């Protein structure tokens, strides 16, 4: 009986989670809550967890955080991976130390983990494009909104969603122009000004999508400007996102 054996064992297990830095109420808040609930539920197994963070817009931050984890030699690691080349440097050293690891949120197939918990991001983006065009119909222009810093969008998941989205558009709506608006990840106070400029330049664009969990940035802007004729698709049931649906 594995359960009885674990209860009888005096071994203590330490796991480390590596997550993107985030504000209270954002997507990763719920993930953290789930981690702590799991540890509480399985406290009989003498498990503990430590959560480390990295800046999702800075690859070197991920590298530094991974170095700190390796120095602690935990029994297992759960991570939200960054770009494959930086993730692989970390996972190679975990494997060399016989430390198992799992991915959450986004998967890297050529750097396979023990397990992955999340969606198929490309299929999600592909399906989102289909939904978008059910709304856009014969419209000739749509827009992708991003939060970006120095060319980095912040997660593999967002990149793969966009790849799937563009694949569908290329296959089924090749004549539709895909516009882009990159909002500064580090300068939120400029969002409304940049959105104002975009809609002055493209007043006829009525459909857009964001592949991150911050659809509320555009949604709240649309509400503040009284724009009720714009269709916006986003991800994740954050409270501020849900409020924009009401």
What do the PLM-derived regions correspond to, one by one?
Residues 4-32, 114-115, 141-153:
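Short beta-strand segments enriched in small/hydrophobic residues
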Residues 28-36, 63, 122, 126, ...:
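Short, surface-exposed alpha-helical segments at coil->helix boundaries
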Residues 39-60, 143-144, 166-189:
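Short beta-strand elements in bilobed, periplasmic/extracellular small-molecule ligand-binding domains
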Residues 42, 97-98, 172, 225-228:
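Helix C-cap/helix->beta junction micro-motif
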Residues 69, 76-95, 165, 177-241:
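Hydrophobic alpha-helical
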Residues 85-123, 238-246:
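Flexible loop/hinge segments that line or gate small-molecule binding clefts
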Residues 116-143, 191-192, 238-241:
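Hydrophobic alpha-helical segments within soluble ligand-binding/sensing domains
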Residues 129-172, 180:
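An alpha-beta-alpha
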């Amino acid at each position: 009986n594995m359960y009885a054996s674990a209860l009888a064992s005096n071994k203590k297990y330490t796991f480390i989670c590596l997550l993107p830095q985030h504000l209270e109420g954002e997507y990763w808040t719920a993930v953290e809550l789930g981690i702590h609930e799991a540890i509480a539920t399985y406290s009989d197994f003498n498990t503990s967890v430590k959560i480390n963070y990295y800046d999702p817009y800075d690859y070197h931050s991920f590298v530094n955080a991974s170095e700190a984890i390796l120095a602690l030699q935990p029994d297992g690691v759960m991570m939200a991976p960054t770009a494959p080349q930086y993730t692989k440097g970390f996972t190679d050293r975990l494997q060399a130390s016989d430390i198992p690891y799992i991915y959450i949120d986004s998967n890297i197939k050529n750097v396979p983990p023990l397990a992955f918990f999340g969606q198929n991001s490309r299929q999600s983006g592909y399906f989102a494009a289909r939904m978008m065009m059910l709304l856009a119909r014969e419209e000739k222009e749509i827009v992708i909104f991003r939060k970006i810093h120095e060319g980095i969008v912040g997660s593999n998941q967002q990149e793969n969603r966009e790849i799937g989205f563009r694949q569908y558009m290329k296959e089924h709506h090749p004549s539709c122009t895909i516009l882009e608006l990159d909002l500064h990840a580090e300068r939120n106070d400029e969002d409304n000004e940049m959105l104002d400029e975009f809609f002055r330049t493209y007043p006829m664009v009525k459909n857009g999508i964001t592949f991150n969990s911050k659809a509320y940035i555009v949604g709240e802007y649309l509400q503040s400007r009284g724009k009720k004729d714009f269709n916006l698709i986003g991800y994740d049931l954050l409270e501020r996102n849900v409020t924009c649906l009401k």
